[in-house]
């Protein structure tokens, strides 16, 4: 299987998001990479499903809460920017203050 660097990155984010979901199910608080991966995966999959950029910018800030993250993680993540593939092309989605 020959994957491009972009495809490898998407696969890595998806795998990290799966780990984050499992940890949340067990009640384990997320660290920085896990929180970013979970939100990023939500945006990428939402774009794939045909949701709009505006929808994803709003919904991306509701994926996880402060209580689901280790102390200080919400303050570390000011913005998350994801280049996602929509039905009409690739667009940049920015989520401001993604953990509230």
Swiss-Prot record:
Gene3D superfamilies: Urease, gamma-like subunit
GO molecular function terms noted in the UniProt entry: nickel cation binding; urease activity
Chief place where the protein resides: cytoplasm
Pathway info: Nitrogen metabolism; urea degradation; CO(2) and NH(3) from urea (urease route): step 1/1
Subcellular localization: Cytoplasm
Stored Pfam families: Urease_gamma
Database matches in SUPFAM superfamilies: Urease, gamma-subunit
Subunit description: Heterotrimer of UreA (gamma), UreB (beta) and UreC (alpha) subunits. Three heterotrimers associate to form the active enzyme.
NCBIfam families: PRK13241.1, urease_gam
Descriptive protein name: Urease subunit gamma
UniProt source species: Rhodopseudomonas palustris (strain TIE-1)
Gene: ureA
């Amino acid at each position: 299987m020959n994957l491009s660097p972009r495809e490898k990155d998407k696969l890595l984010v998806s795998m990290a998001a799966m780990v984050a979901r499992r940890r949340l199910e067990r009640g384990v608080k997320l660290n920085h990479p896990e929180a970013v991966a979970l939100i990023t995966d939500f945006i990428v999959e939402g774009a794939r499903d045909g949701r709009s950029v505006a929808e994803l910018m709003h919904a991306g800030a509701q994926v996880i809460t402060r209580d689901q993250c280790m102390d200080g993680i919400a303050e570390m993540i000011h913005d998350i920017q994801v280049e996602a593939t929509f039905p009409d092309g690739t667009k940049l989605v920015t989520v401001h203050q993604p953990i509230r």
